[in-house]
């Protein structure tokens, strides 16, 4: 910009690029943002920071609707925080009733997975502590991706316990082999 006395050269900060914690967003020769899939940890920060909605996550709503219409065993899962998103009258029980009314086979509170994860991970961490090893949590898939892609030397420190969502999904599939979560 200093090379041009008329300030005709502008470099605008793009929220998506500057929100990316691993610098996975660059620009091509036409100035179009490009996400480097080999660096991206799939945290979603770019999606939430883009004021134009230019970056989006894949929606499976049509797939879910089609599966419900076909009578497949579709299970809904939600984190306990959703209970507070829609007012005092909404509870996990009302969520469950609503999902079943929409055609879902059943509804599970992912808080159950948090309890399962805490139980398994505490055992794993106790063993690591006895062995003098360090451990970090594996509950956040984006964090696990970041460690594997950008800090591979620390990959052995990541707990092998699955996320709460995955734990509940596995529980459902153990109970119903035809389940889709």
What spans do the regions from the language model cover?
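Iron-sulfur-associated redox domains of electron-transfer enzymes in respiratory
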Residues: 57-181
